[in-house]
Amino acid sequence: MKILEKETSIIRVGIADVKIVRTPDKIRTSGLGSCVGLVLYDLEAKTAGLVHVMLPDSSLSKTPDINVAKYADTAVEATVKMLLEAGCRKYALKAKMAGGAEMFKFKMTNDLMKVGPRNVLAIKKHLSLLNIPIVSEDTGGNSGRTIEFDPQSAELVIRTVKQGVTTI
């Protein structure tokens, strides 16, 4: 009798989107400029969530029905909730992230235009409030990124425009 192994799928996460995967599947997002790709995972459960965060703060939203994946202040908690519902343990969650670039340099000193760095700071703040450690990150700079996470190995592969591939 032959045992069938599940074929690996790569689940794609869009902009302002969040998805959860289990091994053997992997999860990927692209188009990370000032946006941040945040991966939360439980290595023992072989489960991970990836959220593609666009903006730091939902208070600027003009609609009452916000997309929680779009904003750092709502995306972190929403992803944690989804992972707990999928069987992960909060104390075992760890984080990796990439993105948060300054894609366009402005001559202004107004921090409001620095969306990438503000996204990174907002995510770090909310992870800290939930006591979730950041294991590694590749943030800042001025180049776009595509990331792919494997919940089996906890490796985050980062493809940076004109800079090649790194794994964290």
Curated annotation (Swiss-Prot):
Reactions that this protein is recorded to catalyse: L-glutaminyl-[protein] + H2O = L-glutamyl-[protein] + NH4(+)
Role summary: Deamidates glutamine residues to glutamate on methyl-accepting chemotaxis receptors (MCPs). CheD-mediated MCP deamidation is required for productive communication of the conformational signals of the chemoreceptors to the CheA kinase.
Subunit structure: Forms a complex with CheC.
Protein name: Chemoreceptor glutamine deamidase CheD
InterPro entries for the chain: CheD-like_sf, Chemorcpt_Glu_NH3ase_CheD, Cytotoxic_necrot_fac-like_cat
Heme recorded as keyword: no
GO MF annotation: an example: protein-glutamine glutaminase activity
